[in-house]
Structures are given as C-alpha cells and as structure tokens.
C-alpha cells in the first residue's frame, strides 16, 4: 500500500478517447469502477431474477430483498404515487451501495469519494424534483416555499430562507456522501499503514501492531455499515425531495 492516505483517491487516466475543443476526453480509473459497479448490479439483478424459484437461492434473495427494501422506502416516504420513480431511486441506491462496497476492497477505487460524482447524482435528483414539481403542480409548486401557519410579518424572511435551503439541497445531499466515504477510507488507510510500519520492526513491532490491527478490523466493519447507511440516507432524502415535488403544499 502507498504511504500517502490520499493516494487512493487519485484519478488516473487509462487511455484517451479523443479531444473536443482542445479538451482531452479520457477514460479513467473512476470511469472503469463506475462501469464495474453497473456490471455487478446487472449481474446481480439479471442473475437473481432469471429462472426464479419458489424457494429463492442466495442471489435471488439478495435481488428480491434489495427490490423490496427500496420499494418500502418509497412507499413509506412518498406513498404509492412515488413508485413511479422506483427505477430512479432503485438505480441510485444500488449504484451508491455497490460502489461503496467495491471501494472497501484493497487496491480498488471509491467512486463516491469524489465530490464531482456525488454532486452529479445530487444534481440529477434536484433537476428531476424541480422540473417534475413544476410540470405536475404548475405555479402551485411554489407553495413549497410558503409554510402554512407562519405569521405574515415574518413570512418574507421565511420564504427567503426556504428558497435558499431548497437550492442548497444538492450541496448537503452530495457533501454528506462524499465526506463520509472520504473520511472513512482515510482512517482505514492510516490504521492499516500503522500495522505495516510496526510489523516491519520485527517481533516487538508486531506486538505493538495488535491495537492498530484491531482498529483496522473495526473500521473496516464500520465502513461496510457506512457503505449501506450512506446509500440509504441518499435514497431516503431523494424520496423526501420527490414527495415535496408531488405534494408541495403538505
């Protein structure tokens, strides 16, 4: 492993696809792991649902549990009407969860540890919420910025705050995922580096490496939990925003 804990987040060019307007278009390790994540998801869902059995096997169970888990989030947060967005929400959950899990494997790349990726996902949700809200509700969509029961004399201030918070949603939506994955992987790399450095000192070093080794195992287990938790948080926030677009006055 490289000594620098930030080295694992470096984007490297694998090959060039060409140039557009003097700007090089390259296929990077980040692109490769995005394709890998999509491939793993495709194999899981296609392999799990092909030749379905009454008593599901392991792959079928994972596929069905993933489907029901996301469907349950949508129904509880956005109601039955929100199921029209199931393909979007399910794709986001699976992509983030699988990308996070792949990133835990040593010598791999964590796609969600880069802000540009999480911002792109958050902006996708934001644009869909904005345009669908306007398409479905017209001008009534702006009721989202006018909470009910607010005294008239402070209503302008509240509306201003609501508008600002609405347009800042992509920031909080993206930074939360990015920061958690970045910090967790840095901590994991630091503890793992301690184990390697102490182990190189011989017997006494290995005795001293027991504590950082235990911490490495603990942080790895925590990162597996965080991988799912961050996918869940991103998904449930997406459902909340979609519910606001469908029912802006609620």
From Swiss-Prot:
GO (cellular component) term, any one: proton-transporting ATP synthase complex
Gene Ontology molecular function: any one: proton-transporting ATP synthase activity, rotational mechanism
Keywords in alphabetical order: ATP synthesis, Cell inner membrane, Cell membrane, CF(0), Hydrogen ion transport, Ion transport, Membrane, Transmembrane, Transmembrane helix, Transport
Pfam families linked: ATP-synt_A
Localization of this protein: Cell inner membrane
Bilayer-spanning residue ranges: 31-51, 85-105, 115-135, 144-164, 194-214, 217-237
Principal place of residence: membrane
Keyword Transport listed: yes
Topology versus the membrane: Multi-pass membrane protein
NCBIfam families per UniProt: ATP_synt_6_or_A, PRK05815.2-4
Job description of the protein: Key component of the proton channel; it plays a direct role in the translocation of protons across the membrane.
PANTHER family found in the cross-reference section: ATP SYNTHASE SUBUNIT A (PTHR11410:SF0)
Listed HAMAP family: ATP_synth_a_bact
Protein family (similarity comment): Belongs to the ATPase A chain family.
Record's subunit section: F-type ATPases have 2 components, CF(1) - the catalytic core - and CF(0) - the membrane proton channel. CF(1) has five subunits: alpha(3), beta(3), gamma(1), delta(1), epsilon(1). CF(0) has four main subunits: a, b, b' and c.
Protein name: ATP synthase subunit a
Gene from which this protein is expressed: atpB
